[in-house]
């Protein structure tokens, strides 16, 4: 930032996520880090107003990467899921979802490649007046629209309705 201030211009691009403006069950740490990144990005944007430095948030959504495989490895390493009260949910839904999600109909229909995100980043670096936010995939654009028109209560109902583990009865 000091170099950008000195030269009078620059671009800071943060790679955020759809989970930086909505939350999904059982993804608390990831949700929290992306919400924090969005807050930090907004703060920087305000603090750097008038300096010639643009602060941009790129929100990819479903992109074909190794995130699911890596998430599964870290989940098994750091979460004592077999002793958790959520064991059934993890076993029946979350672990299989992380294993199989890349082959799901949803992802085949909506998932983009990393090059598509790179093109958006390249564009945001070179366009005269970049947007504050680039929502990359159709699901990200759709959910951004839903966040803007639904109450928090109705948004949560929508997210819960489309979250398989929440449809499973809890053990008492």
Task: State the predicted function of each range.
Residues 133-144:
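Short-chain dehydrogenase/reductase
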Residues 50-131:
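SDR active-site lid
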């Amino acid at each position: 930032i000091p170099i950008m201030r000195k030269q009078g211009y620059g671009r800071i691009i943060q790679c955020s996520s759809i989970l930086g403006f909505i939350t999904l069950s059982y993804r608390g740490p990831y949700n929290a880090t992306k919400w924090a990144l969005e807050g930090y990005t907004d703060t920087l944007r305000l603090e750097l107003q008038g300096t010639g430095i643009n602060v941009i948030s790129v929100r990819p959504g479903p992109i074909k990467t190794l995130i699911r495989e890596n998430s599964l490895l870290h989940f098994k390493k750091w979460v004592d899921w077999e002793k958790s009260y959520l064991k059934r949910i993890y076993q029946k839904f979350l672990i299989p979802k992380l294993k199989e999600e890349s082959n799901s109909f949803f992802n085949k229909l909506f998932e983009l490649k990393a090059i598509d995100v790179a093109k958006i980043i390249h564009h945001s670096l070179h366009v005269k007046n970049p947007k504050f936010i680039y929502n990359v995939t159709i699901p990200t654009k759709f959910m951004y629209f839903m966040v803007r028109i639904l109450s928090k209560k109705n948004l949560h109902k929508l997210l819960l309705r489309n979250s398989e583990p929440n449809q499973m009865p809890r053990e008492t």
